[in-house]
Amino acid sequence: MAVLMFRTVIAFGCIFCANVSANDVYFDQAWLRETPQEHSSVAIYGRLINKSEGFEFLELVTSEQANLVMLHRSVKQQGMIGMVHIESVQIAPGETAYFEPAGMHMMATGLRGRLVEGDCLKLSLQFRSGKAIKARAIVGSVSQMEFPRKKESCLE
């Protein structure tokens, strides 16, 4: 009986592990800038990679550390840089969508605390297909312009 229970636990454990490792959509090199004391919003950057055989549509991003996370694109209108809200991000099979300064990004508003260099912002990304992934974005310096290359504890 004990051997049967052991085999059952191992079998279910392996099924769970296979589902976790079979994830074919990734959000990596996620980062954001440190927030000044008086700011309650921040742009989030990174790479959304689709290694699946079908199109994926990112439709919702949430964080326990913010009231709202929206998808935006920076646009230049009448000589001024502004942002427009986008409903979803389409990623073709084998393609990568880049979230970067002066381009497409996620905007977290209503932050529930100041984020300082080395902190992490936890994100949940949900897709039209029903897939959902978790990610962590590392907080860089106020002047950061790209993913911080040094290894930080929250990403380990």
Named regions from a protein language model:
Residues 23-156:
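Compact, glycine-rich, soluble single-domain proteins
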Residues 12-15, 152:
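Secreted/extracellular small peptides and ectodomain modules produced from precursors
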Residues 2-11:
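Sec-dependent signal peptide recognition
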Residues 17-22:
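N-terminal signal peptide c-region/cleavage motif recognized by signal peptidases
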